[in-house]
Structure formats: structure tokens, C-alpha cells
A protein has these predicted regions:
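ABC family nucleotide-binding domain
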Residues: 3-199
Length: 202
């Protein structure tokens, strides 16, 4: 059996008296493409946010290469660079160009030089078909283009796992296909992913 990257054990999450997650268990291994399926309001997004430490679990544990991610010794920014996340609402910096959106995290968190960060960003922007738009601002892009930039930004941090939090929910139907195509290519390339989406990847 191959080494696990992430292990979720007996995970629970409550907001006040409202229980969202109860006793969740699963493991993620290199190359896995994991899809979280369930009705609206069942806690799928909350689960991904717990895995990225945007929410702190109420009980249970999440282990990354056997290290407890809730341990006080855990370097959270570094962990988040290894377990990246693509959000429903893109979360791009509207005052920055496409290229800058994809380099700022590398420079701040990974301490890469501007030149190295730009070279790396360009590689991933080309991968998602957004290299021609490096000088554009997010407001000049379609929803599908914004999400492809968000994916490139996450990839530029060179994550071991990429979490997709309903990446197509904010898109017009005609834009969904281009984002799903990028996700299919990433899966074929062997990137480990965990996705919450109402759509399947044929």
C-alpha cells in the first residue's frame, strides 16, 4: 500500500450547537482523485476548509505525512502551500495583474525571487491557457478565465494536494467546460486532488 499524504480520523465540526460534520474518516494517497459527494448543506465545503485549516475541527484529527496539522508546532502558511485550495469565488486580488496574482504567494511564503516566481507562474499560466492575459486585471476576465488563473496560482505554489471547493458553481454554464477540462488534465498528469463539485469529470 502506498504512503498516505493526508489522513482524516473521526473528524467533527460544529458551529455552536449545530453539528456539521460527524466522525469523518478517509485517506488521500499520491495520485488519488477524490470526490466528495452529498446534498447541499451536508458539510462538504466545511470539510475542505478544515483540511486547509481555514476552519478548525471541533474533534478528531487530520494528519499530513503523519504530522498532526493542528499541532501548535505546525507551520500553517507552509502547510497551506503544500495543500492548496481553489475557491468557488476565485479570491483573486483585483488590484493585481494576472501574473502578480500568481507570484505574490511564491515570493511571500516560499521566499522565491521575483524572477523565479514569474518563471514558475508563466509555466502554470501556459498550462491553463492564460499566458496571453498576464497583464490583465481580474475585472477584465470572464468567470472561467478567473478560475483558470486561480488554479494556476494554486499550482504555482507547487502543492502536493489541491483542494477544489465547488470550482464551477460561480460560472455561467458555457464557462464550466473550460475549467473542467483543466481539472481533467491535472488528474491525468497525476496531481492529487480532492474535489467538492456537483459535476463529474468524464
Amino acid at each position: 500500500m502506498s504512503e498516505t499524504i493526508l489522513e482524516v480520523h473521526h473528524l467533527g465540526k460544529s458551529f455552536g450547537s449545530h453539528e456539521i460534520l460527524r466522525d469523518i474518516d478517509f485517506v488521500v494517497r499520491p495520485g488519488d482523485v477524490t470526490c466528495i459527494i452529498g446534498p447541499s448543506g451536508s458539510g462538504k465545503s466545511t470539510l475542505l476548509r478544515c483540511m486547509n485549516l481555514l476552519e478548525v475541527p471541533s474533534s478528531g484529527e487530520i494528519r499530513y505525512h503523519d504530522a498532526d496539522i493542528m499541532d501548535k508546532q505546525m507551520n500553517v502558511p507552509e502547510y497551506r502551500s503544500r495543500v492548496g485550495m481553489v475557491f468557488q469565488s476565485f479570491n483573486l486580488f483585483n488590484n493585481m495583474t494576472v501574473l502578480k496574482n500568481c507570484t505574490v504567494g511564491q515570493e511571500k511564503v516560499l521566499k522565491k525571487s521575483k524572477e523565479e516566481a514569474e518563471k514558475n507562474a508563466m509555466m502554470y499560466l501556459e498550462k491553463v491557457g492564460m499566458a496571453p492575459y498576464i497583464n490583465a486585471k481580474p475585472k477584465q476576465l470572464s468567470g472561467g478565465q478567473k478560475q483558470r488563473v486561480a488554479i494556476a496560482r494554486a499550482l504555482a505554489m507547487e502543492p502536493e494536494i489541491l483542494l477544489f471547493d465547488e470550482p464551477t458553481s460561480a460560472l455561467d454554464p458555457q464557462m464550466v467546460g473550460e475549467v473542467l477540462e483543466v481539472m481533467r488534465k491535472l488528474a491525468k498528469d497525476g496531481l492529487t486532488t480532492v474535489s467538492y463539485t456537483h459535476l463529474t469529470l468524464p
